[in-house]
């Protein structure tokens, strides 16, 4: 039982880390999009 609970805890921890990374990537992409919108369109 201890091994199963350890594996479950490890999987939950990995899922939590993946969730945090996804949120950070979304915030980073969103900030880049806002900067592109605020700046005048020089890239044509």
Curated annotation (Swiss-Prot):
**Keywords noted in UniProt:** Host membrane, Membrane, Transmembrane, Transmembrane helix
Looking at the UniProt entry, the stretches that span the membrane are: 9-29
* Keyword check for Hydrolase: no
Q: Which InterPro entries does the record associate with it? A: NS7B_bCoV, ORF7b_SARS-CoV-like
| GO cellular component terms, A-Z | host cell membrane; membrane
Q: How does it sit in the membrane?
A: Single-pass membrane protein
Q: Does the keyword Membrane apply?
A: yes
- Taken from the record, one Pfam family name reads bCoV_NS7B
Compartments annotated for it: namely: Host membrane
User: What else is on record for this protein?
Assistant: Bat coronavirus HKU3 is highly similar to SARS-CoV (SARS-like).
Name of protein: Non-structural protein 7b
Q: Which organism is it from?
A: Bat coronavirus HKU3
């Amino acid at each position: 039982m201890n091994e199963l609970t350890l594996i479950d805890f490890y999987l939950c921890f990995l899922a939590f880390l993946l969730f945090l990374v996804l949120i950070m990537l979304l915030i980073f992409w969103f900030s880049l999009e806002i900067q592109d919108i605020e700046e005048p369109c020089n890239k044509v």
